[in-house]
Amino acid sequence: MPTTPSPLALAQGLIRCPSVTPEEGGALAYLAGLLAAAGFSVERPVFSAPGTPDVENLYARIGADGPCLLLAGHTDVVPPGEPALWRHDPFAGVVEGGELHGRGAVDMKGGIACLAAASLAFLAERGPAFGGSIAFLVTGDEEGPAVNGTVKLLAWARARGERFDHCILAEPTNPDALGDMIKIGRRGSLTATLTVLGAQGHVAYPHRAENPIPGLIRLAGALLAAPLDEGTAHFDASNLEFTTIDVGNPASNVIPAQARAVLNIRFNDLWNPASLEAELRRRLDAAAGNAVRYRLDVQPTNAVAFLTQPDAFVDLVTAAIEAETGRRPALSTTGGTSDARFIKEACPVIEFGLVGQTMHQVDERVAVADLDRLAAIFRRILDAYFPASPPPAERA
């Protein structure tokens, strides 16, 4: 059986490509070469949108019959900041003390390397006729606007007749140790600006002005007075946070003309953006009455809450993780949003990857042992998802 590259070698190769979003940096080209050499058909479509950079993406597939397992991720990374603050060059892929250092080691070039290493080893042993299909869907637009990436790549694939049965997105899901957590859903995110209107005037003549600040305090209090919900079996309670309050008034002797607050809600699957906006307006109208003039501007959002119901596929992934790590992972929907919100429109999706403690930080790094174990977990998943047929003698 031919030797296939280790997850460490693949991760180093990806990290050494400076693919700071939206730059491709050679990362997709590197991955495309590996997959093409293993027999995948590979395409690299570029998508555009007004006001956003053009972004290159990758789609690769091997096999035509049977179930299709989609393996997804992104090769773009956030900027490293000041390189002098790093122990090693953030794009050198240095191993020190059993850890691989570099931007993207955790989020998420390490995860992609493990998906690729597992797939290449699986194909080297089983060959191309393994009773199904494996597809890679990798974008260079996840850390940026997320406009010309996964959402368009999925639409492009769908228009070509591509269909997927299940997906693994290799985001760093584990809080402390490999095997801690699988993400089976994500909360939605909604941002809105609340503006209370007043009338500017001199503070010494308040009867000639209308101060919007008391009205803003009143309306903000109404939004926070009662919880939005109590949560569900798989989701925490929805949470509203004010992130800024501002009047844009540098003068201490002037009553401002308006006061503004920005809020963000991370919501569970009891809500959608329309129903959540309706609830906000209901609370605001009740508190404002005829005394407070306000405007609520809700930003469009594509981050809607979703849940992949625990089923046989989730059980298969859980069993692979437990067999390799000895830990039974929690099924969680915590944290921020991810490209899983787009993939769930194509097929059931779960997220599992590395330990996320150093993602987006200076000296981002991952234990080499975790790369090996994550690749082993993915290999177990592939073996279970595409079980080998018994030899003819055993079938008889």
UniProtKB/Swiss-Prot annotation:
<keyword id="KW-0378">Hydrolase</keyword>
<dbReference type="Pfam" id="PF01546">
    <property type="entry name" value="Peptidase_M20"/>
</dbReference>
<dbReference type="Pfam" id="PF07687">
    <property type="entry name" value="M20_dimer"/>
</dbReference>
<feature type="active site">
    <location>
        <position position="76"/>
    </location>
</feature>
<feature type="binding site">
    <location>
        <position position="74"/>
    </location>
    <ligand>
        <name>Zn(2+) 1</name>
    </ligand>
</feature>
<dbReference type="GO" id="GO:0009014">
    <property type="term" value="F:succinyl-diaminopimelate desuccinylase activity"/>
</dbReference>
<feature type="binding site">
    <location>
        <position position="107"/>
    </location>
    <ligand>
        <name>Zn(2+) 2</name>
    </ligand>
</feature>
<dbReference type="InterPro" id="IPR005941">
    <property type="entry name" value="DapE_proteobac"/>
</dbReference>
<dbReference type="GO" id="GO:0008270">
    <property type="term" value="F:zinc ion binding"/>
</dbReference>
<dbReference type="GO" id="GO:0019877">
    <property type="term" value="P:diaminopimelate biosynthetic process"/>
</dbReference>
<feature type="binding site">
    <location>
        <position position="143"/>
    </location>
    <ligand>
        <name>Zn(2+) 2</name>
    </ligand>
</feature>
<dbReference type="GO" id="GO:0008777">
    <property type="term" value="F:acetylornithine deacetylase activity"/>
</dbReference>
<dbReference type="InterPro" id="IPR001261">
    <property type="entry name" value="ArgE/DapE_CS"/>
</dbReference>
<keyword id="KW-0457">Lysine biosynthesis</keyword>
<comment type="subunit">
    <text>Homodimer.</text>
</comment>
<keyword id="KW-0862">Zinc</keyword>
<dbReference type="InterPro" id="IPR050072">
    <property type="entry name" value="Peptidase_M20A"/>
</dbReference>
<feature type="active site" description="Proton acceptor">
    <location>
        <position position="142"/>
    </location>
</feature>
<dbReference type="InterPro" id="IPR011650">
    <property type="entry name" value="Peptidase_M20_dimer"/>
</dbReference>
<keyword id="KW-0170">Cobalt</keyword>
<comment type="pathway">
    <text>Amino-acid biosynthesis; L-lysine biosynthesis via DAP pathway; LL-2,6-diaminopimelate from (S)-tetrahydrodipicolinate (succinylase route): step 3/3.</text>
</comment>
<comment type="similarity">
    <text>Belongs to the peptidase M20A family. DapE subfamily.</text>
</comment>
<feature type="binding site">
    <location>
        <position position="360"/>
    </location>
    <ligand>
        <name>Zn(2+) 2</name>
    </ligand>
</feature>
<keyword id="KW-0028">Amino-acid biosynthesis</keyword>
<dbReference type="GO" id="GO:0006526">
    <property type="term" value="P:L-arginine biosynthetic process"/>
</dbReference>
<protein>
    <recommendedName>
        <fullName>Succinyl-diaminopimelate desuccinylase</fullName>
        <ecNumber>3.5.1.18</ecNumber>
    </recommendedName>
</protein>
<feature type="binding site">
    <location>
        <position position="107"/>
    </location>
    <ligand>
        <name>Zn(2+) 1</name>
    </ligand>
</feature>
<comment type="function">
    <text>Catalyzes the hydrolysis of N-succinyl-L,L-diaminopimelic acid (SDAP), forming succinate and LL-2,6-diaminopimelate (DAP), an intermediate involved in the bacterial biosynthesis of lysine and meso-diaminopimelic acid, an essential component of bacterial cell walls.</text>
</comment>
<dbReference type="GO" id="GO:0009089">
    <property type="term" value="P:lysine biosynthetic process via diaminopimelate"/>
</dbReference>
<keyword id="KW-0220">Diaminopimelate biosynthesis</keyword>
<dbReference type="InterPro" id="IPR036264">
    <property type="entry name" value="Bact_exopeptidase_dim_dom"/>
</dbReference>
<dbReference type="GO" id="GO:0050897">
    <property type="term" value="F:cobalt ion binding"/>
</dbReference>
<dbReference type="InterPro" id="IPR002933">
    <property type="entry name" value="Peptidase_M20"/>
</dbReference>
<keyword id="KW-0479">Metal-binding</keyword>
<feature type="binding site">
    <location>
        <position position="171"/>
    </location>
    <ligand>
        <name>Zn(2+) 1</name>
    </ligand>
</feature>
